[in-house]
């Protein structure tokens, strides 16, 4: 976005890229808008991102906001030309189209990450699944994949530019390829990258859904030392009934089995996971199953979300857990996560690892 805005001649403007994962994220976005306007009243404010895509009117109604643009529009230089100095206020204040009609996701690939030695390549966007708690598909649209050839060419350019590590990212990364000819799998993409970009030192995968992991990805985990031994899993909960109410595609035993199999193939594999505390109807017994899952999967890095009702989602209509109890349960999970991190760090004492300086 920054490069597009600069190319279009946009100046003296604050662009706020919003998040919609939780109600708290939306609140903080609006708080930041008001803060920036107080501190820099002479600057125009343009709002974009998932929260703006999902509920543009709530931002357009703010006196501090000059323009609201959607997730597709923010990737178009023509949008930014229309918002360049002198034109804000003359174009439509809200420019947000139907994200569900978008079928392409390749044109926004980024070539520059400043002084960092790690680069990110978004190979997939959107999600075809409808978990009952999640609003993100309405901000990102349906699942769409970047063709493998485009991904490989992008990574070659990044490696030629000096990047030592590439991270593959996506909203629902393990669904990569489902919309492409011959429906390749994520493992096919990983193997192709490692084969065709031999000078790439490290390849890392961001958050995945373990139930969708394919055989080639498991083979890469077992045989490719350049594939980093760290996987972040979208687990969300440790109780089967809650997982069903979330409309997740896996059960508790599926998660445990995947972690056991992956660690057999790669003994140094480390897992992180997203876990939601206080999902509607969650009892103490349900919650305890999430706590136990941390040990049973031997998770090291926990990303704990206190449940946040998102308007329009099925979960928002389910019987809610008391807010204080949600916070208490989230705190217990975070404490559990802190303990797992400390255990992992103690286990590294005396060991030697090759490391990457992320920002030399």
Language model regions located:
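Short, acidic/polar
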Residues: 285-292
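Conserved SAM/AdoMet-binding glycine-rich loop
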Residues: 45-49, 54-55, 160-284
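Contiguous mid-protein beta-loop-alpha structural module that forms a pocket-lining wall or clamp
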Residues: 282, 297-299
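Structural detector for short beta-strands of small beta-barrel domains
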Residues: 349-360
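Hydrophobic, well-ordered secondary-structure elements that form the walls
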Residues: 233, 274, 294, 302, ...
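Short beta-alpha connecting loops at secondary-structure transitions
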Residues: 243-244, 315-321
């Amino acid at each position: 976005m920054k490069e597009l805005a600069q190319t279009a001649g946009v100046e003296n403007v604050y662009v706020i890229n919003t998040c919609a994962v939780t109600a708290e994220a939306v609140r903080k976005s609006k708080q930041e808008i008001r803060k920036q306007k107080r501190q820099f009243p002479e600057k125009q404010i343009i709002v974009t991102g998932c929260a703006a895509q999902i509920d543009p009117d709530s931002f357009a109604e703010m006196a501090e906001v000059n323009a609201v643009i959607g997730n597709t529009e923010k990737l178009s230089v023509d949008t930014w030309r229309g918002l360049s100095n002198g034109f804000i206020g003359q174009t439509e204040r809200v420019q947000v189209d139907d994200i569900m009609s978008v079928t392409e996701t390749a044109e926004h690939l980024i070539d520059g990450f400043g002084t960092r030695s790690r680069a990110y390549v978004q190979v997939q966007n959107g999600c075809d699944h409808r978990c009952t708690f999640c609003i993100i598909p309405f901000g990102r649209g349906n699942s769409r994949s970047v063709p493998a050839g485009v991904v490989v060419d992008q990574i070659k350019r990044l490696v030629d530019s000096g990047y030592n590590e590439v991270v593959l990212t996506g909203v629902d990364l393990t669904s990569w390829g489902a919309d492409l000819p011959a429906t390749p799998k994520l493992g096919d993409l990983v193997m192709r990258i490692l084969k065709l970009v031999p000078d790439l030192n490290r390849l890392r995968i961001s958050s995945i859904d373990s139930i969708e992991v394919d055989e080639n990805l498991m083979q890469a985990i077992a045989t490719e030392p350049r594939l980093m031994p760290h996987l972040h899993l979208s687990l969300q909960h440790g109780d089967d009934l809650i997982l069903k109410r979330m409309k997740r595609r896996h059960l508790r035993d599926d998660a445990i089995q995947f972690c056991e199999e992956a660690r057999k193939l790669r003994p140094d594999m480390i897992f992180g996971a997203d876990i939601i505390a206080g999902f509607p109807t969650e009892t103490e017994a349900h919650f305890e199953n999430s706590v136990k899952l941390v040990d049973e999967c031997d998770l090291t890095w926990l990303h704990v979300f206190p449940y946040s009702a998102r308007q329009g989602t099925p979960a928002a209509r389910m019987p809610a857990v008391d807010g204080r109890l949600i916070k208490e349960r989230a705190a217990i999970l975070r404490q559990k996560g802190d303990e797992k991190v400390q255990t992992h760090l103690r286990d590294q004492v005396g060991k030697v690892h090759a490391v990457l300086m992320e920002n030399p």
